């Protein structure tokens, strides 16, 4: 086998890995993770189980790689959609719309199943550090723009929203309530507490 043939095989496998990730993540999002077997992914793609296992050792590795790619794509999407926002409240509205659409397209079982895979759970926990950094910038900008109170303790605020997010996930509230209701009755109510009068008016426009 010459070098050109080796490169072609490598490119083919790389392309196939991408197709496998896309197919698997679509299936996980539609049916829940535990409901989808590796065999199902192979059948959907028309490839053998052997080929699939040559590229991904097991379902957790496949899910882990898929979540990483999805997370990167979502960060790019949010940056692209918010780059022209004039203030933090416009950013909040944009991210809210993205999250609502994301939840509408995803089976609640997907979120319930995620925590059952330790490698994925650890990755998501690590991602919280990035989210914390972005949230701190968001709060600081909100203060400078007059939407958030100057006496807000950023560290305590981060702990509050961490606790809220954990409570929603651990109690699977997304299975009983719409994402709109969760945001309006939990997230936005808590956010209102750090808003100035100007911020409350802007937040009410978003909720309304």
Walk through the language-model features, giving the residues of each.
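Basic, helix-initiating cap at the start of DNA-binding domains
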Residues: 1-31, 35-47, 61
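C-terminal peripheral helix-coil segments that are non-catalytic and often amphipathic
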Residues: 1-4, 137-141, 145, 177-208
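Short hydrophobic/aromatic patch on the recognition helix
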Residues: 46-56
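Alpha-helical DNA-contacting segments of helix-turn-helix folds
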Residues: 61-70
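Hydrophobic alpha-helical connector segments
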Residues: 65, 76-105, 158-161
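Helix-loop "lid/cap" segments that line or gate small-molecule binding pockets
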Residues: 81, 94-101, 110-113, 189-194
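Short secondary-structure transition hinges
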Residues: 100-137, 143-147
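Hydrophobic alpha-helical bundle segments that form small-molecule/ligand-binding pockets
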Residues: 129-157, 161-164, 168, 172
